[in-house]
């Protein structure tokens, strides 16, 4: 009995002196060194994806490539998203802890890429898919997330909780977000993080702020119907072009007199089509465009104002209006959780001193489907600067000349890793 007691005591001492898996703190130095060791991998992934962009709903080869790289890294639960080409993967440490979502978008744009960048310099490589490009940086987003996954997998014995990696298709067309939300709504997330490369932010800087960081979006799409006829007898027709132009003029007046001007909403009319030849009055005209806003209610009210003006002015011209099904407020502003933003700003500034900013001038009027993830959990979205005039990476997103400074990708990876690993230890 005495010998058994000694053995039991020694066993208890041994267990007490053994580090508990998942409790090790990852130092900033270790994190930065790890990111550096994967620099070649990050660039390789980004360049492959840049060569072969695919648009929303058709990212077949992109998804195949991403899943192949995940299988090379290790074992994950991989789930396809029903009704979508998107998917998500889970890394479960099987230890108690928080559940963190990390997201990337995966689609490209139907734009022919220019071999010349924003400063007139030749790009080192361009898309091999003619007519398509990663002109918004989604290739970089995927490279950031894959590298982050690789490092988290390497560190899995040091971590607690669960990571869910979200590969969202069709961000540009808003087609992938709702199927993704439906597919993951059963998961209890503690936080969801995403980032976006930004050509308006200096390379090597990470923009972090609480509140609205990217704009909400409403689509404009309507037809004005009159009665066509021969151009020589306009009195025998009802010309919808006059009605349509008066609608736009009246909207411009109402914009200043019937809206709360303290809440900025930008109005972009981008399409005006009517008629096919010079001597025929058309039956209809088409107007299209977009609204962008940082206040959801202001955006909705502005959309309703346009509909009212269009209906009333068309009626005054004996015309009618038909609004497109897509003419709705589709995406809310991206709103960062204050607690997460404060935490991230402090921890990422500690990782990259002098490389974080909260300057309001970097607010981006583009829209992001990431906004909808706040239906599931508190969210944080950061902008990673890629603007480098010396390299020529200054062109705006969605342009043929768009390019990125690949050196900036390390900051995106570091910020994502710092958030993901530190956030698991946040007290509730």
Region locations from a protein language model:
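Histidine/acidic-residue-rich, glycine-tolerant segments that coordinate divalent metal ions
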Residues: 109, 123-133, 139-140, 152-282
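Acidic/His- and Gly-rich active-site-bordering loop/insert found
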Residues: 24-134, 139-160
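Bacterial N-terminal signal peptides that target proteins for export
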Residues: 1-8
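Metal-dependent amide/peptide-bond hydrolase catalytic core
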Residues: 24-26, 245-428
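Divalent metal-coordination and catalytic microenvironments
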Residues: 49, 89, 102, 138, ...
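Cleavable N-terminal signal peptides
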Residues: 9-10, 20-21
